[in-house]
Amino acid sequence: MAEIDVTKADVLRAIETERDWWRAVVDLAAGNGPVTGDEPVNGFWTYREIIGHVNGWRRWTVARLEAAANGTGRPVPPWPAGMADETEAGTDEINAWIMEQSRSMSLDETIAETFSLLDQMRDAVERIPDKRLLTPGVYTDIDPELATYPIGAVVGFSILHVHEEHAPDLQAWLSERIGQHAELPPTPSGFGYED
């Protein structure tokens, strides 16, 4: 892996840029009439389900960042024991579980959780010492993959997932909803990390 020049300020700025991006999505969706959350976005998931899916995985991001900030070692994943994301089938099983959990939440609750998780990410990053946040191999007790990545990279991975997998669908849906190209803030930096 090539060395990547990232600072704690870069990580915090990316979280705030992600917050701005989500605020624009929510505002654009609500700015053109009532939104129930059940509007189909991509033929597979609704608006609320996409947000719930992102939140489900962000809970795991927050858990790992909190473990690093608190020095508590590997956290328990937010999904049931026995589910693992090491294979595509395992990831599909986790996604189905996340989807089932998110269906019990209202759109307002789902959106509120989005911003709460971003706050938790920011707060945890602020508490992790700079060098430990950005040095690979420091937190292998939290996640073995962190042998080659710093804990700060999980923020980048979380952001990349949204903007590679879900942002194009959300932007297309918003554009259709408002009847013109939906202008969203720039994509936050993933710091050059690739998951």
Residue ranges of each PLM-predicted region?
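Solvent-exposed interaction patches of small proteins and small membrane subunits
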Residues: 2, 6-16, 39, 71-73, ...
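Charge-dense, helix-prone N-terminal extensions
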Residues: 3-5, 13, 20, 123, ...
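Acidic/His metal-coordination segments adjacent to aromatic residues that form catalytic metal sites
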Residues: 3-7, 44, 94-108, 144-153
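Alpha-helical bundle segments that constitute or directly flank the non-heme di-iron/ferroxidase center
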Residues: 4-34, 56, 60-63, 158-165
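Short amphipathic alpha-helical segments with heptad-repeat character
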Residues: 12, 16, 51, 55, ...
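Structural signal for well-ordered, non-membrane alpha-helices
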Residues: 19-30, 58-62, 66, 115-129, ...
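Acidic/histidine-rich alpha-helical segments that form the ligand environment
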Residues: 24, 86-135
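Short, contiguous alpha-helical
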Residues: 35-93, 133-195
